[in-house]
Amino acid sequence: MKVPALKLTGIALGMMLSAGAMATNPGTPGGEQPGTGFPAVSDFAASGPFSTTNSNVNTTCAVYRPRTLGENGLRHPIILWGNGTGGSPSTYGRLLEHWASHGFVVAAARTSNAGSGEEMISCLNYLVTENGRSTGTFDGKLDVNRVATAGHSQGGGGSIMAGQDSRVTVTAPFQPYTLGLGHRSSSQSNQSGPMFLMTGGSDTIASPSLNARPVYNRANVPVFWGELRGAGHFEPVGNAGGYRGPSTAWLRYHLMEDSNAEGLFYGSNCGLCSDRNWDVNRKGIN
């Protein structure tokens, strides 16, 4: 199925349509230091403690990262990012910088057609190689056993495709488009780790019922499906609006062992479960 080009090629214009100003971003309930040694934070939606930088490391990947890597022996988890159709890493630059400020190394595929997930895995291969070198920016400073895939729209579908790689720990697709554009439905039942499936209650481009519901039903892994009420398709553009805090919490919990983030998703009275801005379905998550 082909999506009308007028809807998907103008993602950058969606910043004007974002409902982010109306959405809440839950903070952490406490300040216990994550098990991996990264600093605790008091608000997942606020910038983290690391100063950041970004650059195009090759023709296929842009990397957003803490300016100084490996301080105090830290090994930084990896997030692979896929853009929506017509978008680029800079389209989502404030979100990617936000994650980098929390200590993640974010490798964004430099393609506007990320639906196959191939370019995202290419970025992972690059970082794994660089981490194994004896010298260089990334030498021995990355935790290649803690890897997430994330992306928006076509890139969200791509993040599910890339989520089949056995090196992937967890996924976080934003409003994934899963009806074509490189996406294969067989990937949905072949995931390597838990998924935070994010949709928008007012999304008319990647309709949750057509694009996300089948993913939720087919997934072979635990899924937290959170639908942000009132969010249109372009909410993730820029700083990701109401998705920023929860997505950061999900990644910190699974990649940094940040127990402060656990309560947003897990437990009988999880934070997002009782948040009036979110509609939640959980599968294999208690």
Spans of model-derived segments:
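Short conserved active-site loop signatures built around small residues
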Residues: 24-74, 166
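Gly/Ser-rich "nucleophile elbow"/oxyanion-hole loop immediately N-terminal to the catalytic nucleophile
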Residues: 68-75, 118-157
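Short beta-strand element of the alpha/beta-hydrolase
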Residues: 73-84
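Alpha/beta-hydrolase-fold serine-hydrolase catalytic core, especially in secreted/extracellular enzymes
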Residues: 229-230, 237-286
